[in-house]
Amino acid sequence: LVAIDKTLFLETESETGETVGYGVPIAAYPSEAGKVIVNSPGSGELKDGREDRWRNLGLYLQKRGLASLVTFNAPRPDFQVQLEWEPYSYQGASWNKILIESLSHTIDWSLENAKELCGNASPDIYLTGFSSGGSSVGAVAHRYPSVKRILLLSTYDSVGDPFYEGVTAFTGDIYLVYGDQDPMAGYLARILRTGKFAAKSFLVREAPECGHRFDGEANTKLLTQAFHWAFEGDNSQPLNPGN
């Protein structure tokens, strides 16, 4: 099995009503696992991830027949226009909006091509997102009945109200992992724990000796463990960089 590389060509509107075209590169790692994981990287990452971590994870899941990973990236912010209400923009359009739309179109593409991706035309879809990518996952997961679980990694509420509105409306299982050296993500985890959710379950793990970016070999292993924990239902083992 090999990776599938694809670029979606999309359009959105700038804040002044002009049409903005943009491309969303996708990498997919097909398997016969019968389930698809759509990954939304952080704002500073391309689809393959920092040090190719999402590419390596896609190959890992593919080789073991565990799941078919689909990963993408929205266009990088270009700072041509400074919007009043958010720090990032792309050709005058809200970057948060573009990120959410990019994820939605990637999910749509994954559903349309599910048979080729995982051997199942109507699979369960799992979503995962890192940092701002996790914020976009929280915003859109509730729109898709086939999305059963989401994994939020080092997640901030960067897309704003759509994140809170979406994550509280999602009816599947929510898994959240953050590093013990990432106070902002830890603060959001505490806020979410006190909120009212439609979710079937809400489980939180704190990764030891870990910062926001999950840098280093040990923390990369923690990311892999987090995927096993969330998407294989193994809730028995703590996240441990020594495993």
Feature annotation, model-predicted:
Residues L1-A27:
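A domain-start/cap signature at the N-terminus of enzymes
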Residues S146-S158:
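A conserved short beta-strand
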Residues D180-G186:
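Acidic catalytic loop of the alpha/beta-hydrolase fold
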Residues F170, L176-Y178:
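Short beta-strand/loop motif that positions the catalytic acidic residue
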Residues G186-S201:
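Conserved loop-alpha-helix segment in the C-terminal half of the alpha/beta-hydrolase fold
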Residues T128-V137:
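Gly/Ala-rich beta-loop-alpha elbow adjacent to hydrolase catalytic centers
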Residues F79-E84, S89, K200-N243:
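C-terminal catalytic histidine-bearing segment of alpha/beta-hydrolase fold enzymes
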Residues G17-N120:
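Serine-hydrolase catalytic machinery in alpha/beta-hydrolase-like enzymes
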